[in-house]
Amino acid sequence: YQCGQGG
């Protein structure tokens, strides 16, 4: 899962 702020 990648949060969208640098992973």
Curated annotation (Swiss-Prot):
Record keywords, A-Z: Antimicrobial, Fungicide
Query: Please, which domain of life does this record's source organism belong to?
Result: Eukaryota
Q: Transcription: present as a keyword of the record?
A: no
GO annotation terms (biological process): defense response to fungus; killing of cells of another organism
Does the keyword section mention Metal-binding?
A: no
Query: Briefly, what is this protein's role?
Result: Has antifungal activity against B.cinerea. Inhibits HIV-1 reverse transcriptase.
Q: Any other noteworthy remark?
A: Inhibits HIV-1 reverse transcriptase with an IC(50) of 10 uM.
Protein's name according to its UniProt entry: Ascalin
